[in-house]
Amino acid sequence: MMSYALLAFIMLNGILALCLRKKESENNVSGNDAIQDNRIEQLTLVSRLLLYPATFFLGAGIFLGAVWANVSWGRYWAWDPKEVWALITFLVYGVAFHSQSLRIFRKPLFFHIYMILAFLTVLMTYFGVNYVLGGMHSYANA
């Protein structure tokens, strides 16, 4: 849950950055552009710093869940939809770690849009799998 909270905060930072960008484009005041860009850069920095513990906690949750599954069912991984979507979420956020090697992630606007869209995987993992898809972690048929 800690990872989901941090990822939600990153997503909210992205929405705020997009709102600031929209406000900047509507006003077009030259002196105000530098202030807005500075705020967007600060939001980007905060989001990038929060991405590390968020992804760590997400990975730790997947790892501990696998250990618990081995104790309970005798296997670490069963390719259950919840497990698969947790892995997809982990990989999607893992891509954002490569901001130095992937030039497109250096642009704050792209980074924030990516973080907003990446949060859809969190929503699918948390709600979609539980209430829509089947599997061990599903409440859709209950």
Region locations from a protein language model:
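Hydrophobic cores of alpha-helical transmembrane segments in multi-pass integral membrane proteins
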Residues: M1-E24, Q42-S72, P81-A142
